[in-house]
Amino acid sequence: MISSNYSYPLDPSWNTEDITKVLRFLNQVEHAYENSVKVDDLLDSYKEFKKVVKSKAQEKQIDREFQRTSGYSTYQAVKAAQQQAKGFISLGR
């Protein structure tokens, strides 16, 4: 069972602005699973996230860590948003 109290996969070398961008993206992913999220909001936050997390390897590592602790996949959320293109997505179980 996934705990509702989990930590976010953050890099200690990030500055406050970078942490804010990453957290905004992870929060949008949470909203996609827990309720629904506007596709544009999720994709915009992903673009900002990618300015901080430039490498695919680090992005995959963050996805794995976040999925392990929260049960939510950043990859699946972005994939669904890109396929939907507009409106809202909901990945709730």
Swiss-Prot record:
SUPFAM superfamilies attached to this UniProt entry: BH2638-like
Source species, domain of life: Bacteria
Family according to the record: Belongs to the UPF0223 family.
NCBIfam families xrefs: PRK04387.1
Protein name per its UniProtKB record: UPF0223 protein gbs1030
